[in-house]
Structure formats: C-alpha cells, structure tokens
C-alpha cells in the first residue's frame, strides 16, 4: 500500500481542447545541408547487417534515403497504366499499315488493271499491294464501311492463272515489284513486343523493393529480425545519479550492476546471478529509467524493445525476433535486454483469456522467450529486465525460478522520495528563493516521478510565458493546479448556477470539516477549471498506508455532501453529482465485497480481483443470493451515511449559508479562509503548508486516493475520465469493479 494523493470532486464541464501552436506566418528556418556544420544527423540510417546498430552510410557519407516515387502510390499506378497504353499503341497502331482500300481480286482489281487505273503493285506471296492512279471507293459509297484511297491491297486466289495476270499487267504498263513471302515479325521482335512491358514493370518493382530494403534494413526479409534499439554503455547518459525516490528498487539492482562489472567475483563462489529481473509498478514510477540506469552504471550494451513489437500479422515472426534479439545480446555479452510492457505477450495462457485451442502468435512468442531464458548458460553475462504495470496477469512460467525470479516492486515515492525526485528534476531549472521543494513534496502525495517531472516542466513553461527570469512559488502553484485540474476557463454562469454550485461545493466542505477522520479541506472554489464548474480540495496531513472503516465511511459522507446540500436548499436534484455517486458506490462495494467490512458478508472476497477473472466467460464466482446480499449491504452503508449527512447539514445550515456567502463573494477560499467563512474552528494538527494547497489525481484504476476529494457538480453529459498521477496505496473503486479516486465522471448540471 502506498500514500494518498489528494482527492477532488468537481462540478464538471468539458474544457475545449487546446489548439496546438500555429506556425502560420512564420518563415521556416533553412535546414542545414548534410555536410554543413551543426547539421543534425540523418535519421534515415539503417542498422548494419551485424545487427549492432551501426548506421550504414551511403556514398556521400549521409544516411541512405528511402526512394520515394513521385506522386506516391497513385504515381506508380499512373506510370504502369502509361506503360500498358504505350505497349498497346505500339502493337496496334505504330506497326499498322497506312489506310488502304481492300478490293476483291475479281472483278474489281482485274477491272482496274484493264481500265489502266493501276500504277504500281508489290507482290509478297499471295498478297498484292499497290497504288491506283485515281481514288477508288470500295465498297460503294452508300455502304457505311466504304473506304476511298489510292493505295489498295488484295489477295490472289490459289487457283488464279498467274500467267494471264502477268500478261495483263504488262499490257497495261503496270510496274511490278516482288519480295519473298513475309512470315511475320522475327522471334526477337515478338518477344520484345509481348514481354517487354511486363519485364519493364517487374524491373521497376525490383528496383523499388531494393531501395526500400536498403532504407528499412532488409525489406521483406527483415521481418524475422529483432527491432531492438541498441545503445552502448558509453552512450548511456542515465545512471543511478538520475534515479531518486526509489531507494529500495535501486538497492536490488545494484547487485545486477556488480555482477555485470565483476562476474568472476560470483562465479568463483558458485553463485548464479538471476537471469531475469521483473520491474513492476504503476505507470510513471521509473521502471524504464531504472533499467537504463543499470546499463549506464555497468557500461554494457543495452537492447530495448517493447513486447508489442515482437508480434506481427505473419505467423512465426514474433518467435524469430526473440531468437534474433537473444542472439545479438549473447554476441555482445555482457549485455542487458530490456522488454517493456511484458504483459502484452506474457499474459497467462488458458483460463478463458483468448482462443480455446488454436495457434496464438503471442503464445509462440512467449514460449520462445521461455526457451531462450532456459538456454542461458550459468556463465552467460546477459540479464533480461522486463517491466509491467500488471504483474498479476503474467503467466506463471515467466515467474518461476530460473526466469524472472527476481521481482522488484517500484512503488510510488513517499514525501522524502518526492523531495529527492524534485531535486533531480530542478537541477537545470533556476528557482526563485521563495520556492520550497519540501512544501511542494508535502502537497503532492500520490504523485510519481513522471508527474513531478511534468509539474516542474509546466512551472518552467509558465514562468517563461510570464517573462520571469526564475521559476517562482506562484508559477509552481499555478502549474500544479493546471496539471491536476486543467487551465481556468472563462465561463459566464448565471446567478442561479453560481449559487447552486456554491451550495454543492459548500456541502462537501462542511461535511469534510465536521466529519471525524475525514481529510482536511484545503481549498474551495467555484471558478470553472478544466472540466469542473467548481472544486473542493482535500488532502491528508501525511502519507497514508492503510485505511480504516471510519476513514472510508467518512469519504462516503463527504461524497454525499454536495447532493444532500442541494436536496436541503433547492428541494430537487441535478445530474451534477454523478461522479460523487460512482465514487461512493465503488468505496461501499469494496468495503463489502473485497475488504470484509460487512458483518453480513464477513471476511469473504465476493468481488473478483482485476487480474483473476472467472475460469470461463459468463460463469459467475458467487451465487445470486450472495450478490443480492452484497447489494443490500452496499445500500445499507450508503443510506446510513446519507441520513447522517442530512442530519449534519440541517443542524449546521447557518454554517453552510455562511460559507456559500463567502464563496459567492470571493469565489475561492483557502483552508483558513474557508473555516473562517463557515464559522467553524479549525481543529486540524499543524502541517507544513504547501505553496498552494492542491489535490493530486489518482491512478484511475487500482488505488485509493486518500487525498483531496474534489466534490462536484458536473456539466451535462460530459464524461471526464481523470487519470491520476498515482497513489501511494490501493484505492477503492468508483463502480462495482473499478476504484475510488481516479474516475471522475461529469453529470448533467
């Protein structure tokens, strides 16, 4: 279990998506030439055939560029059509004879000779071609197929008297030419005319495929090659100096570093280093950073690849890439193989999660990984590091001794861890004297390393936009609000909407102030921000690692405060409490079905955990009567809390009205001002005050956010899924299978 992020409930309205900055009107900078100083390296380089990541250079020293046909795919299609059309024209028109009139041998041809209208003939076998002295039309002009021309052709029948024809031609002074019979075009010409265009098209595609193969590292034949990115030990700029806030995980990995540096030290004593290390933890905790730091500290080659990159639509490619990756790592040993998001291919086999029988490509890839890890010799200095956010769904064969037998949980940092992370990320950021990193660490429970890095970056961008020389305390505070809630919106709400929003948020705040064990109220606001029309911030005084029943019931009461306040004051309801209802229902269901906080159910888990579904799809794990009893217990807890909140707000109606008046006047009230406006004494213990009390989002999935609970009226039909930076401990769901904190859904205001 880990610490709580601040919680929030909100009056939701969707913030329009921000437009990306436009480059319109700007003159694009001239790109430096390939050989000019300061020019960036050409990214279109291909890995060397040895797979070691050495770029293959072209003749001019630059990277080999992939060939791009003008016009893309359409250009290629047009080019092919032009070739086919050219072939048809050559065969049909270019070699076709000029226009001639074809006349019968008898009586037309013979009659034209006798009339003296034949000037010259050329005889080729039985074919006669020649020229008339005057135009001849055949067939007659009234025929639609008639042709008029001086050139003619005819065929001499086999039974014709050639001697008589010869005498007739001589008598009429006709010039006679003769040539041997033409048996058609030569074999070479026929081949060129018939297959030339096809051969040309094939040659074009071969040329294009070779160019693309050179640019993509092998083209079609590279499917089975590993696509792992390799970085040498000297190139890795990440070391344990860049890792902070996760000392326990760092200590676990130091032994791996020592083995890679001094393997003889362990082999001499018969020790065997773990073949695989599994890093698990919520997103953003630094699993990938840890793996790179191990490679950087050890100074060995680092092969990194996402598990999803192994699988392609071609069967067998995943297993082939696994073999190639491990082959490269063994050749470069000592080395580290890092597989990110292992659950993409390492999901447990069987159990109804996929095809029953059948040949699943992911299973082939998983089997190949298991085989390769079994094939490591005890002296092979190759360490496999994998990262996953969901270790509970991994196949048991991956986790047995001899494979990923060392498991390192990378948890969300505590307050001291967050302070160390902030120091790492602010090394290159000039901070003003009023920035207190300890206060920031205290005000960000539940945030992980990625969230804190984003916070520092947003603060730096905000300071630059404001023209500050250094990042100030106000920059950090405003950046934290923006990261958690989004930017402020200029929304013109009616007086009635502002008043209803003020009562909704004040209801959350008053219940939080008067409920024992609830998180302190840090800030109340009716200024629209992000997807909220108003928010109430709550956060614990210190990181929480466990939750008692009183605390969880208190969270349910605070979630009901806004809805009950509307009932009391306006006598009707709105859809603005949708996310509140989802959140309190999720807490109550987990109290009954997972945490054993119901005497009627007892210490029995009747809600399936996220990683362990039913054995077969559609098969329930609990009986209908048990499920009905769970629903009854959930209703009992919620109804009891609703009655208590109604009594509390009726008794303190004056405090509620007073806080609403302060909100309508000031719009935003900090912790001290909120208690003063409500007329209640602040009995909370002293705590280190952050630069501005802010909530932290929680992991939308599996953790309880004990932090600020933004209470809210959400906007109409605008669902808003808020993913948290992370929580320090497991968190109850917002619905029957989800968790509290993290899922904030906007309703209809």
From Swiss-Prot:
A Gene Ontology cellular-component term: plasma membrane
Organism: Conexibacter woesei (strain DSM 14684 / CCUG 47730 / CIP 108061 / JCM 11494 / NBRC 100937 / ID131577)
PROSITE patterns: AAA (PS00674)
Extracellular-side positions: 97-186
Residues engaged in binding Zn(2+): 504, 508, 580
Protein's UniProt name: ATP-dependent zinc metalloprotease FtsH 3
Gene this protein is translated from: ftsH3
GO terms classed as biological process: protein catabolic process; proteolysis
Subunit structure of this chain's protein: Homohexamer.
Primary localisation category: membrane
Annotated spans, Disordered: 1-67, 679-749
Residue intervals on the Cytoplasmic side: 1-75, 208-749
Keywords noted in UniProt: ATP-binding, Cell membrane, Hydrolase, Membrane, Metal-binding, Metalloprotease, Nucleotide-binding, Protease, Transmembrane, Transmembrane helix, Zinc
Similarity-based family: In the central section; belongs to the AAA ATPase family. In the C-terminal section; belongs to the peptidase M41 family.
Membrane topology: Multi-pass membrane protein
Known role: Acts as a processive, ATP-dependent zinc metallopeptidase for both cytoplasmic and membrane proteins. Plays a role in the quality control of integral membrane proteins.
Cofactor binding mode and count: Binds 1 zinc ion per subunit.
Localization: Cell membrane
Residues forming the catalytic site: 505
EC number(s) reported in the record: 3.4.24.-
Cofactor names: Zn(2+)
Biased amino acid composition, Basic and acidic residues: 1-17, 679-689
